[in-house]
């Protein structure tokens, strides 16, 4: 493996790219009927708007491969270069007893095994701490060779279910009901623990990093998820380096890395598309009803709403938002307009898609730099293919070594 750039150099390159081009990735096509950058790149905008919904879906997960007008190819090449990161080395997958996989969905089981295979530390962990553990599936997998295990979870039903599973499987585990954001959460963490978090959201994994540093945990492993699940409207950088950046991120901005979807089934995709097309059709209607050409946020709606006809959907949503009642509308035309806008939105979002991974790496490096500033040696890389989960980045940290490494292809 060739020597990799330092964490700082990687962060600075990503920061320059994201800052310079933020006018391309910050505006959201779903909210804005026209995007500011369309005036600068009319050929690209017209080309994208003329494409079908199926075209957009085909390019969604690999937007960089799209042969689009300038400046798309140049941006795609830079984004691809900045996003290069290799998988972390894996140990031979252990033979996992069928009983150990009790109650674990297949995809989650594979994620757990891939995550566990990458946890190489100088010191053999003696006590695993499964953060936001759910039923403790990850912790039990890691502690199968006899290490101690503590599982922290706020949902009492999951705590009880996990405790029963551990007892049934003969795993010596302590399952505790704990709100990890509460002021007493630090009492559960000790320097001898090896904390692990597989897809802990936003504030939850940030809290773990902060407490692990405060408690001087010797080593830890975190695969972040849902960076936008934070309390504050504005993102508060964790490291001194990110704090000095001119890039000021909102909670909405943090949702960009999560827009990649590879695990949804056909039915889920159909429902998602219908929901978005109907919302966009309603958006056209509400602008007319309010006589204001601006987006109106609407709440998440139960799936039963999609079983209404479109006219009833719009009437009921207008009532919910306390808007004037719709009059005589051409409902089929309005619904068609919603589907047409969805095709345009999805294709315009391909520009934002070029910045998904760079922004995710910027956020991951902010976390890594925080740990490096506190004396940790940090390794970053993927732990599984993106087809298994798009959130496949893993941060490994060990206290007391000056070296750092971002795993990149040779």
Which role does the model predict for each range below?
Residues 125-134:
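Conserved class I S-adenosyl-L-methionine
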Residues 135-146:
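Conserved SAM-binding loop of SAM-dependent methyltransferases across substrates and taxa
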Residues 170-180:
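Conserved SAM-binding strand-loop segment of SAM-dependent methyltransferases
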């Amino acid at each position: 493996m060739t020597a990799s750039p330092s964490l700082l150099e990687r962060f600075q390159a990503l920061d320059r790219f994201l800052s310079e081009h933020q006018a391309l990735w910050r505006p959201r096509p779903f909210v804005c009927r026209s995007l500011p950058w369309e005036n600068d790149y009319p050929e690209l905008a017209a080309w994208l708007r003329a494409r079908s919904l199926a075209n957009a879906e085909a390019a969604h997960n690999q937007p960089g491969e799209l042969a689009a007008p300038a400046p798309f190819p140049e941006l795609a090449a830079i984004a691809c270069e900045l996003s290069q990161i290799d998988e972390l080395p894996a140990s031979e997958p252990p033979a996992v007893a069928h009983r150990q996989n009790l109650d674990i969905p297949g995809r989650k089981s594979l994620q757990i095994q891939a995550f566990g295979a990458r946890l190489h530390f100088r010191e053999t962990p003696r006590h695993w701490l499964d953060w936001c553990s759910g039923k403790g599936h990850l912790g039990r997998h890691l502690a199968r060779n006899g290490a101690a295990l503590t599982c922290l979870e706020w949902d009492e039903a999951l705590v009880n279910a996990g405790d029963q599973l551990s007892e049934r499987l003969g795993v010596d585990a302590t399952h505790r009901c704990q709100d990890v954001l509460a002021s007493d959460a630090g009492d559960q963490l000790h320097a001898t623990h090896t904390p692990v978090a597989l897809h802990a959201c936003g504030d939850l994994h940030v809290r773990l990093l902060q407490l692990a540093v405060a408690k001087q945990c010797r080593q830890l492993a975190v695969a972040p998820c849902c960076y936008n699940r934070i309390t504050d409207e504005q993102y508060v950088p964790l490291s001194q380096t990110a704090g000095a950046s001119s890039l000021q991120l909102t909670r909405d901005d943090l949702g960009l890395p999560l827009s990649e979807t590879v695990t949804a089934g056909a039915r889920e995709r159909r429902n998602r598309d219908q929901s978005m097309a109907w919302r966009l059709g309603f958006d056209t209607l509400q602008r007319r009803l309010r006589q204001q050409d601006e987006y109106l946020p609407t709440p998440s709606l139960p799936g039963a709403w999609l079983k209404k006809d479109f006219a009833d959907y719009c009437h009921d949503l207008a009532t919910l938002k306390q808007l004037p009642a719709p009059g005589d509308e051409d409902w089929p035309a309005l619904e068609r307009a919603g589907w047409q806008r969805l095709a345009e939105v999805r294709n315009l979002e391909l520009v934002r898609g070029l910045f998904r991974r760079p922004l995710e790496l910027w956020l991951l490096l902010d976390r890594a730099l925080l740990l490096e500033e506190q004396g940790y040696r940090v390794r970053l890389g993927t732990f599984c293919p993106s087809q298994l989960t798009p959130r496949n980045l893993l941060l490994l940290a060990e206290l007391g070594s000056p070296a750092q490494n971002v795993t990149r292809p040779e």
